[in-house]
Amino acid sequence: MRNEITGGSPSLSRAWFALAVLALAAILGITDRQMLTLAVEPLKRDLQLSDTSLGAIVGFGPILFGALASPLLGWLTDRVDRRWLLVACVLVWSAGTALCGLVTQGWMLFLCTLTLAVGEAGLGPVVYSMLPDLFPPALRTAANTIFFAVALFGAGLGIAGAGAIFSVAAPLAHALSIEPWRLAFLLVAIPGPVVAGLFALVGHPPRGGTADQHERAQETLAHYWRRSGAMLACLIVGYAMAAFYVGAILGWAPVSLIRDFHVDVARSGLYSGIAVGGGSALGLLASVVAVRCLRARWGRLLPVVIGCAMALLAALLLLMLSFATSTAMLLACMIGIIAAYIAGAALTPTLLQDIAPPHLRGRVVGTSSLVTYAFQAMSVPSVGAISDALDGAPYALLKGIVWLGVPAAVFSVILLGLVLRTFRTRFEPHCEVGAQAL
């Protein structure tokens, strides 16, 4: 199923259909995950959990478990029919979401969130391994950008949709004599089997790649790591540090709206959705403008340059979050931080695809996911622990985000700065990243 560039090609039509279903799966996964964030307060009340326990159950545990599962799922991605692997992942995380609505103990919720996390961990390796084989080189970066953009805007839609589901569930739950959050989890799990069925219709493309990648077709993972590992490690950890402070924002800012600014659950979901969607749009636009204006100057270094600059901007915005005493100011800082992160991360998928041979692509993406998940896993419970230690102090959650987020952003700047210094001699990608993108 090698693609041609003709728009009327049946294989290309199937590729666009596959991209649409992959994007839909990403939106569904985000919605399921954000449902946990918006349900924090009723879960805390009904299951009698502390912020630290909630951080471990909703954040640390599932994210860490997903991180550990990512390399295995990346290995499977490189060896099995990626179509059926994704179908299995969607069904697994949908089952975990539905079971969250049936729990009565904290440990039961923990097991359900682990199930959800394992299913979602397979999405990244499958998508970023499959897109280069679905689309010809001339359309690959465009396909990556479209999926990245849809997933970004889907994050806003996901959290807003989760809030809307809570609103719909409330009157129905009253009629059924159950807690609204339980019904909300059951409702949000319904689309999962439908999306899985749609993707089952997609054919499995043969694994391909560029001429340079074919020359390295027999390269082992160990040899690849010896050749490119040092700078790859700096790059992955640098972006993971950015994911750390963004994870803290996404995990606790909606809760802070409810707890510190007395916003109800539905409006918290709506406001947070607007902030995530608006920040995503601004970040993607900033990335497009930067590519068009700076590509000639920086060439293949551009993704790292943008990432370094945006991490520095995020550090300044996190400092401003210390002074947020109104809903509007919190949302403004949230929009800016998310925009800075997105602008830096927009070209990362294409960069990883360019530096990885086709037969190792799933494992490279899986390794990147493992590191990113690990840092995200630490962000949510760490902020929760600071909140508990402050014992009811005003804006305790925001203080935790700032105290941990600023050092993370600074460390991201340092690591990406190291990449800039040695990129040309120790970490050579095989095409100009961003030259065709956007």
Describe each model-derived feature in a short phrase.
Residues E4-L12, H204-C234, D260:
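Juxtamembrane intracellular "pre-TM" segments in multi-pass secondary transporters
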Residues L36-T37, S228-L284, A345, P349, ...:
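Extracytoplasmic gate region of multi-pass secondary transporters
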Residues A39-L68:
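Extracellular/periplasmic helix-loop-helix junction of adjacent transmembrane segments
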Residues I57-L73, I274-S287:
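Central cavity-lining transmembrane alpha-helices of secondary-active solute carriers
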Residues A67-G106:
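Conserved MFS/SLC helix-loop-helix module at the cytosolic interface between two early adjacent transmembrane helices
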Residues L91-T104, A311-T325:
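C-terminal ends and interior cores of transmembrane alpha-helices
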Residues C112-A151:
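Cytoplasmic helix-loop-helix junction between adjacent transmembrane helices
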Residues F147-L201:
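Helix-loop-helix hairpin linking two adjacent transmembrane segments in secondary transporters
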